[in-house]
């Protein structure tokens, strides 16, 4: 079976990245094309991409003129054709002045912008005759209206991937003011619309797929998700193992492999020196690369870190940005621990790689985690994850039991400062035993987190959709759940 699959998303690595969704959209189509599928990506042409894509020398090539132009929500949408840099994946860029600001998310017009984008994608799929998809693979609330609009298209199926259920997009009353809604539309917001009307729904890890069926993690949509039944499943994300390879990564001070970890000591010293920490190969160096938001467990970190630094000969490095309150608290903590703690605001890809390749442990005390990619990258680089058992962290990190020689990291269950502190202390104590610690590192490095395994599961999902009967019959009221 060869399917024509259109990935619709707000971001795609390497050209536009805020969260893990960009890594999925930028990596999975590459692997699917290697498996013989005709996969293409469509996303907004943001203002910061205008200088990168164009017909001029030195720019990523794109069509000089739009390949498609049409009225959408009373405005003209233009679509240009290009290729995702570094790949052979065709890329469609939706152009409109609303995408001109140099940002991806936020702003007063965020809901309008992505409703406009979703509408343009649906119109494009209906009317662009040179290439017509069999399946539109939608990602998060930004594209949630596409399955609703395509629900009566007999020849186009939809997959809706939930990357983070907490963000649900505009409500129905807001949608009614912006665009037209199908007569059968009965969802309260765009996240619910994507779940309700997609032929298949998946989350980015099996555990998260189970968690969101409960009131604790369902964000008010647990009944709808439970109604979805077998059409909701979890497919674990992967990572680009060619990009994230400690043997060849140019961002590292020294490359290394599972057979020779000596380069990690060089990277550790370089990381300490670069960030003004005391250079000491024997100190327990903790690293973290994350958005500073409640989801990532930053409040737990703030409650725990001062006491743990006082208890142990350890250091801590954090790279990230987010809520102003958390940024301020982290900055204050770094000032209290000169030479032992460093905070770098923003996102610096090369520094992130050096943290993976030089830190001894990687902290992920998440309140919830749909999948998480950082722990996979950390393990590939021999950086041992310390994670709370939630969502995709359950599926990727197993607790280290030294006496049995099993496990790839350290885990704790309750979202409590005491549990996090205890987990840190156990990892610190294990770090003192170099032989068992190195064996722990190597088990993590040997774990297969490539996209190949995940891509095969997505292929099976696409096959299910290709074999479905025509969809218009499913719009009758007896096949709809209660309004969601």
UniProtKB/Swiss-Prot annotation:
Pfam families reported for this sequence: Glyco_transf_5, Glycos_transf_1
Catalytic activity: [(1->4)-alpha-D-glucosyl](n) + ADP-alpha-D-glucose = [(1->4)-alpha-D-glucosyl](n+1) + ADP + H(+)
Gene Ontology terms: biological process: glycogen biosynthetic process
Keyword Glycosyltransferase: yes
Keywords: Glycogen biosynthesis, Glycosyltransferase, Transferase
Function description: Synthesizes alpha-1,4-glucan chains using ADP-glucose.
Name of protein: Glycogen synthase 2
């Amino acid at each position: 079976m060869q399917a024509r699959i259109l990935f619709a998303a707000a971001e795609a690595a390497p050209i536009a990245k805020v969260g893990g969704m960009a890594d999925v959209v930028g990596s999975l189509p590459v692997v699917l094309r290697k498996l013989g599928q005709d996969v293409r990506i469509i996303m907004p042409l943001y203002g910061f991409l205008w200088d990168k894509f164009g017909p001029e020398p030195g720019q990523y090539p794109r069509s000089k003129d739009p390949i498609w132009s049409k009225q959408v929500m009373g405005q003209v949408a233009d679509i240009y054709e290009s290729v995702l840099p570094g790949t052979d994946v065709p890329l469609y860029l939706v152009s409109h002045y609303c995408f001109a600001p140099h940002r991806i998310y936020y702003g007063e017009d965020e809901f309008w912008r992505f409703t406009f984008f979703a509408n343009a994608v649906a119109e494009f799929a209906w009317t662009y005759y040179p290439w017509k998809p069999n399946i539109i693979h939608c990602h998060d609330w930004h594209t949630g209206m596409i399955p609703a609009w395509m629900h009566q298209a007999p020849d186009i199926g939809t997959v809706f991937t939930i990357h983070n259920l907490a963000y649900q997009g505009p409500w129905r009353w807001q949608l009614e003011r912006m665009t037209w809604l199908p007569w059968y539309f009965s969802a309260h917001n765009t996240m619910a619309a994507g779940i309700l009307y997609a032929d298949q729904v998946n989350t980015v890890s099996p555990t998260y797929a189970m968690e969101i069926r409960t009131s604790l993690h369902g964000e008010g949509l647990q009944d709808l998700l439970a109604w979805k039944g077998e059409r909701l499943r979890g497919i674990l994300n992967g990572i680009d193992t060619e990009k994230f390879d400690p043997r060849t990564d140019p961002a590292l001070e020294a490359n290394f492999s599972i057979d020779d970890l000596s380069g990690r000591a060089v990277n550790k010293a370089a990381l300490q020196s670069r960030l003004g920490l005391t250079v000491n190969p024997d100190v327990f160096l903790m690293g973290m690369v994350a958005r500073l938001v409640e989801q990532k467990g930053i409040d737990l970190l703030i409650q725990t870190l001062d006491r743990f630094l006082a208890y142990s000969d350890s250091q801590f490095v954090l790279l990230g940005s987010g809520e102003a309150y958390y940024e301020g608290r982290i900055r204050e903590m770094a000032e209290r621990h000169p030479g032992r703690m460093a905070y770098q605001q923003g996102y610096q890809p090369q520094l992130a790689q050096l943290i993976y390749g030089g830190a001894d442990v990687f902290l992920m005390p998440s309140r919830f985690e749909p999948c998480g990619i950082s722990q996979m990258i950390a393990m590939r680089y021999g950086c041992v994850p310390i994670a709370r058992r939630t969502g995709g962290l359950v599926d990727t990190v197993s607790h280290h039991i030294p006496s049995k020689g099993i496990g790839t990291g350290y885990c704790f269950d309750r979202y409590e400062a005491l549990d996090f502190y205890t987990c840190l202390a156990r990892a610190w104590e294990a770090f003192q035993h170099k032989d068992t610690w190195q064996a722990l590192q190597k088990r993590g490095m040997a774990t297969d987190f490539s996209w190949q395994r995940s891509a095969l599961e997505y292929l099976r999902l696409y096959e299910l959709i290709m074999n479905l009967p025509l969809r218009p019959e499913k719009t009758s009221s007896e096949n709809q759940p209660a309004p969601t």
